[in-house]
Structure formats: structure tokens, C-alpha cells
A protein has these predicted regions:
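Short acidic, hydrophobic short linear motifs in intrinsically disordered regions
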Residues: 2-12
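DNA-binding alpha-helical recognition surfaces that contact promoter or target DNA
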Residues: 8, 23, 128
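Short amphipathic alpha-helical interaction segments
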Residues: 14-30
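A short, conserved structural fragment
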Residues: 29-39, 501-507
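Short, cationic-aromatic polyanion-contact patches
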Residues: 39-60
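Charged, amphipathic alpha-helical regulatory modules used
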Residues: 61-168, 455
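Conserved phosphate/anionic-ligand binding catalytic regions in large, soluble enzymes, centered on
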Residues: 455-472, 631-635
Length: 635
């Protein structure tokens, strides 16, 4: 370090002390404890200096032990002398313990600490000791409140190695370590034990536990020429320029996307996108729009999907589709997708473009309704005035588990489903309050500020059913699957009417995809045995509805799918798989699906190379271009 830095750190701050400091500095130089780098005008420790410093530290620590005084390395990044007052203060303020009891526990902790004869005493070690005393004394309720959240050193070290392989960099490492703490906080503090036990046992599943209590899953945001972003910004987002972008709708959209994508967990749906794209826009400009939206989205492993609503009647539809086609060709895993509303108006000569987009891993959904919005994951929502709502879901029921517990009894299956639904509903009620508090506290500043973009006072609460088809196969009944589903869902819908106690939320079922499918099957293998589960499913339970070329011609499959869509009010994720390798057949499948369903999305089963990013079809195990590992776009 420099002369002035060294002087300040040594405590010689006044000018009149400069001579005294220079005297001591010369002494250290003569004894070869420090050396001077004349070129950089800096001083550094020599090898002898380090040896002397380490020896001095050891002597100091031993002297502390001999004197009976102990110093604690606290979580405030300071060395503090050990005193029982800090333990008493923590027990009283954090755990709510009576003072006399806290003094007794602190005294016991002190006697044990002095028996340790350790020179390296830390705050976490003292807390662990106090918690062990509380357990021994049967004071479990206080121990629970005194728990310390965090990760073991080994796990943090492993995270450094693992996160780098994902390609998201240092932000992903920070997110993963933060998620670990927030997950523990949710399960230990914010949720009651019965809901936590249901999640841990596999009866229900809470997705992305680290973010579950922080952010909404899906936000339906309105963006049009009347959205007044900068007029409401006031003292928030001080790092954002205060330009007047009222007449620059695409710049306005980029600003909204930059701020809002940080506050949404799963998907951000922009209603009215095609209305703000100029009619005379060309394909190159459309590609630039998609690039800007990609670059202004939060870039880490929590990146939400961006869905842009496009009206099939728009004069710029062709250019938007062609621009999106070029965008997905250049992007291995596009996080931007198009939701085409009023899709029955699409001209058939555009089906070729839709197919090509899907073959390049693009995300296209077709919605014949122009008033009901449908997200990429199949969630339904309607505008309230001009503003869209938030969706809070991420709670899934393990339907095969319910069927296995019912042991082929149809009546018990329905009753058990309704019983598990109570836990799911209670979890969502708590989540709604937690996120509302986050909005009030300013933790979600965009959502709390911009009332003409997001409806913050009204939430759609959604419970997902995972493995419904496997569950129906397990229920031994003379009734058809359609009848069992009808009676079960109608019973749940009636129950939902009784629990929507206020006018600011509503409950509904969904059939969508999340991370519960693989977790449920693993937990069920542990509970019921691998051989029993093997006959039900292999790697994951079914989610949503997948339709291929053969299914489109299957009347019973179509009838069953239509019934599910009719019954399940929250939305059904219907996906049409383009897998025939015959473009004419696939175009006919799209046309037929449009005549059968009000909503579906298009997918093609692809594999993307993790090394070169190229896309390839077919049953291949390694990249055909560079022999790299492959990632499936849909699993």
C-alpha cells in the first residue's frame, strides 16, 4: 500500500505525527520486515514480516487464553470481547424469552464456552451451543426462533463449481446462495408446520421455494400509447433517465421490460404489443425490437419468459412473424414468445412461417379469443379495465399420490383431493399476504408504482394438478375417466367458492407444467417402492396436455381434452407437437387444432448443443457438428 494509506491505517492521522510515523517506518525497513517498491511507490510485507506477524497473532491468542478473556468474531465483521449480555439480549429480543430464563441459559453457555479452551470463537458457534442447551432443556419453541439461516461451507464451495457450468455467471451464484437462505426462512418462519410437512412429504409442491414468497409468478402487463411510465416514476429508479418517451412506445416498452422483468418469477405477458409496433415496420426493425427486449431483461438463471401479444388482424402481422423467425434462428433458447390473439383470423398461407418458427425452437401460441389472455404456460386472465392482473400459483397437487393412498376407492379419491386442496389454498392465502406486504414495503417498486401497467390489488390464485392422467388410471372405477374428472373438479370448484372470502382474489385449478413432475415421482418411489411407480410413469408425471398428429384425429382424446378445458377455469396448457417432418401435414394439424380448441401452443421436440448452440432434431445423443452434449428443449 502507499505511504499515506499505511500512515492512516497505523493510526497516525494528524500532520504533527508524520515524523513519529517516519521514524517507525524506517525501523521496519531496517529490520527487513517491510520492503519498498520504488517504481510503484508502495510498501509490502516481506516473508520475514509475515512470519513475525503470524507469530504475534499466535502469541496474542495464547495470551487471551491465559488471561481468561475471550474474543468473538461476530457477524458484524468485528472482534468483540465475549460477554453473556449479548446472549441474553438475543434470547430476549429474538426468541421472546423471559429475562430470568435467558440469564440461566446464558450462564450455562458461558461455563461451557470456557471449557472449550478455543482461541477461535465465532458468533455461529455460540448460537449453535445455545440452541443445543435449549433442546436439552426442552425449550424447543425458543430454539426455533433462534435458528440461524445459511449454507454449510462445503455447499458454498460446491456452488462455485456447479454454477459456472450453467453459463449464467456470478449473478447465478449470488441468486443460488440467497435462495438457500430464503428457502429456509420460508419453511422455518413464514409457513405453518402442516403446509411445510405436506411440501416436504410430497403431497403438495411449492415451486422455486427461494422466490416463492418474494415475487408473483406471472404478470399480465398493459403497454399501449397511453401508458404514462415516466410521469409516475417520481423518486424511484434514480438510475433511469427521465426522458419524455410518451410518444416513443417501443422505448417505453424497453423501459418497462428493464424494470418489471426483475419483479416477476416465471412469465411477463405484454398485452397490446402489436398496437405499439409501427404499421410500416420492416423485418430488420422487428428483429432489433426482440434483441432490445432480450438485452433489457434480467440476465440470470431467474429470467422470466417474455410473451408478446400480437393481434391476428394487425397489418404488421407478417413482418412481426418474419422478424421473429429470424430472431429465433439466431437464438438457441429464446425466452421471448408470441401470443397471437383472434387466431381464427390468421391466413393459411402464414402457417408455413408458424411451422418454421416452431422448428427453430420459437414459442408461438394461438388464442381464438381476443378478450381472454393466455400465457405461455396456459394460465387464463382478463383485463380489469385496461390493466391485467398478477397470477400467484406455484402450488401443485400430487394426484398419483392421492390415487395410491385411495387404493382404487373413487369416493375416497375425491375426498382426499379436496382435503389436500385445503393445504394448497392455505398456502396460497399466505403467499398472497406475503407478496402484498412486499409491494407495500417497496420491495417490488415497479408493481407498487405503475397502476396503469399492472393491477396490484387483484391476484388470481391457482393450484396445479400434476399427474392427473396417471391418477385416473389408478382409480379402479366402472365410470369413465371423463366422469371421474368432472365430479372431482366440480367438487373442488364448489369448494373454491367458499374460500374466496374477499373480492380481491379468486381460486381456480390449472393444468400446467412446472418442476413438480420429477420431484413427485422421486418421492413416490421412496414411499411406495420403485416397482410400483415404474408401472405408472418412468421419469416424471404428466403435466398439461400434449397432442401430436395422431391425437388430432382421435375423437375420444379430443373430447376428453375439450372437457378438461371446459372444467378447469384457471387454464390448461395444451401443446400441439409438430413431429411429422411433413410440412403440409403439420399445417393441416394447425388448421384442425384451430377448429377444435380455443387455445394451444406449438412445439417441436429439439435438442440444443450446450457447446456450440446448434439445434437438431431426431433421436441423437451427441451434437452432430461438434460432438458436444445436448439439452432437450422440452422434457
Amino acid at each position: 500500500m502507499t505511504y499515506s494509506e499505511l500512515k492512516t491505517l497505523a493510526g497516525f492521522k494528524a500532520k504533527k505525527e508524520s515524523g513519529k510515523f517516519a521514524y517507525h517506518l524506517r525501523k521496519l525497513l531496517r529490520q527487513s520486515l517491510i520492503a519498498q517498491n520504488r517504481a510503484e511507490r508502495k510498501y509490502m510485507l516481506t516473508a520475514l514480516g509475515r512470519l513475525v506477524l503470524n507469530s504475534a497473532k499466535q502469541i496474542e491468542e495464547q495470551a487471551l487464553l491465559e488471561s481468561g478473556r475471550l474474543f468473538v468474531r461476530s457477524s458484524k465483521h468485528k472482534m468483540e470481547e465475549f460477554t453473556t449480555d449479548r446472549i441474553i439480549h438475543s434470547l430476549v429480543t429474538e426468541a421472546g424469552m423471559p429475562v430470568e430464563l435467558a440469564q440461566r441459559v446464558a450462564s450455562e453457555a458461558e461455563s461451557r464456552i470456557y471449557k472449550f479452551q478455543t482461541a477461535y470463537l465465532t458468533a455461529p458457534l455460540i448460537r449453535e451451543l445455545v440452541n443445543s442447551i435449549l433442546i436439552e432443556e426442552g425449550l424447543e419453541e425458543y430454539r426455533h426462533k433462534l435458528s440461524r439461516l445459511g449454507m454449510p461451507v462445503y455447499d458454498v464451495t460446491e456452488e462455485f463449481d456447479k454454477v459456472g457450468e450453467g453459463g449464467f455467471g456470478i449473478e447465478a451464484l449470488v441468486n443460488e446462495t440467497a435462495n438457500s437462505v430464503l428457502s429456509e426462512y420460508l419453511l422455518l418462519v413464514q409457513l405453518p408446520h402442516d403446509i411445510v410437512d405436506s411440501h416436504l412429504s410430497g403431497d403438495i409442491h411449492l415451486s422455486d421455494v427461494g422466490n416463492w414468497s418474494l415475487r408473483p409468478d406471472i404478470v399480465f402487463a398493459t403497454v399501449d400509447n397511453e401508458t404514462k411510465v415516466m410521469k409516475q416514476i417520481e423518486g424511484k429508479f434514480l438510475f433511469v433517465p427521465r426522458w419524455n418517451i410518451l410518444n416513443k412506445p417501443l422505448m417505453k416498452l424497453a423501459a418497462i421490460n428493464y424494470l418489471l422483468s426483475r419483479e416477476v418469477r416465471k412469465e411477463l405477458y405484454y398485452h397490446g404489443f402489436s398496437n405499439v409496433v409501427p404499421v410500416d415496420v420492416d423485418e430488420k426493425d422487428v428483429v432489433e425490437i426482440f434483441n432490445i427486449l432480450t438485452y433489457t431483461s434480467v440476465q440470470n438463471n431467474n429470467l422470466p419468459r417474455i410473451t408478446l401479444e400480437v393481434d391476428a388482424k394487425s397489418n404488421n402481422l407478417l413482418n412481426i412473424l418474419n422478424g421473429y423467425k429470424e430472431y429465433v434462428k439466431a437464438t438457441p433458447f429464446p425466452m421471448l414468445g408470441l401470443a397471437i390473439i383472434d387466431a381464427s383470423k390468421i391466413q393459411e398461407d402464414l402457417f408455413d412461417i408458424l411451422t418454421e418458427i416452431s422448428k427453430n425452437n420459437g414459442v408461438i401460441s394461438l388464442n381464438k379469443d381476443s378478450k381472454t389472455m393466455k400465457s405461455f404456460y396456459g394460465f387464463s386472465a382478463e383485463l380489469t379495465g385496461k390493466v391485467g392482473p398478477m397470477i400467484l400459483g406455484s402450488v401443485s397437487l400430487n394426484m398419483p399420490r392421492i390415487a395410491l393412498d385411495a387404493q382404487s376407492d373413487e369416493v375416497y379419491f375425491r375426498a382426499r383431493t379436496r382435503l389436500q386442496m385445503q393445504n394448497a389454498v392455505n398456502a396460497l392465502k399466505i403467499r398472497k399476504k406475503l407478496i402484498e406486504n412486499n409491494i407495500k414495503k417497496g420491495l417490488l417498486p415497479f408493481i407498487s408504482t405503475f397502476d396503469d401497467v399492472v393491477l396490484k390489488d387483484y391476484s388470481l390464485l391457482r393450484v396445479n394438478m400434476t399427474g392427473l392422467s396417471e391418477a385416473l388410471a389408478l382409480v379402479n372405477s366402472t365410470d369413465s375417466a371423463e366422469k371421474i374428472v368432472t365430479e372431482t373438479v366440480e367438487s373442488i370448484n364448489e369448494y373454491f367458492k367458499t374460500v374466496a372470502e374477499d373480492g380481491h382474489s379468486d381460486f381456480a385449478l390449472t393444468l400446467t407444467s412446472d418442476d413438480s413432475a420429477s420431484r413427485f415421482i422421486q418421492l413416490d418411489r421412496d414411499k411406495f417402492g420403485r416397482s410400483k411407480i415404474k408401472n405408472i410413469a418412468l421419469e416424471r408425471y404428466s403435466q398439461g396436455i400434449l397432442l401430436n398428429h395422431d391425437d388430432i384425429a382421435n375423437k375420444s382424446k379430443i373430447s376428453y381434452t375439450k372437457k378438461l378445458v371446459e372444467l378447469i377455469n384457471g387454464g390448461v396448457d395444451v401443446k400441439l407437437v409438430l413431429d411429422t417432418k411433413d410440412e403440409r401435414k403439420e399445417n393441416k394439424d394447425i388448421f384442425k387444432a384451430l377448429s377444435l380448441f380455443d387455445y394451444f401452443s406449438l412445439i417441436s421436440l429439439l435438442k440444443i448443443c450446450s457447446r456450440c448452440g446448434r439445434k437438431q432434431q431426431g433421436n441423437v445423443s451427441r451434437c452432430q457438428f461438434c460432438n458436444g452434449g445436448l439439452i432437450s428443449n422440452y422434457s
